[in-house]
Amino acid sequence: MMAEPVITNQIETAPVANNGTAMAPYMMSVALFVGAISLNLMYDIFTPRNYPKNGRSWWASKISVLSAVGICQSLIMVTLLVKVNGLAPSSIDKTLLVTLLTAFVSVSIVMLFNLLFDKVGSFLMLIFLILQLSGSGGTYPIQLSNSFFEAIHPYLPMTYSIDAYRQLFGIGGSISMDL
């Protein structure tokens, strides 16, 4: 045993440049969701500026503002990560698409809960964020979590944004299954 040490052979199936690139999918998803919560806390989604003709026009007036901020947030985040931090996704267009969709989904979910439950909705979204932090498989494979988090994993939006980002930043696969 001592005379014949074990020789290992390491094979990297999805190499990434550094730990920051490996954590970027998780932190980008978290940033977009936290941004959606913050935006909904600051922007009054209840009081219309002008009295709307119907519910659809009221919704369109509110979601357009929230989506515009989400688009700005997405563009700023991707630009800074690429230009300042040196993030090198396989496709910048697909990265922007995933970021914009993630921002829109986050804003929509948070807005829905704020509309249904008022300020309690923001609190529920904080709890939902905590569940997503643990159940999305962002830091460690979900198989290392307990059965509760494995059970909720497929139902969490961050699960899919994190996987799509991983495809773009390291694996090089398709994002179509995550959209």
Please report, for each region that a protein language model flagged, where it lies by residue.
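Membrane-spanning alpha-helical segments of multipass transporters and channels
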Residues: 1-4, 9-179
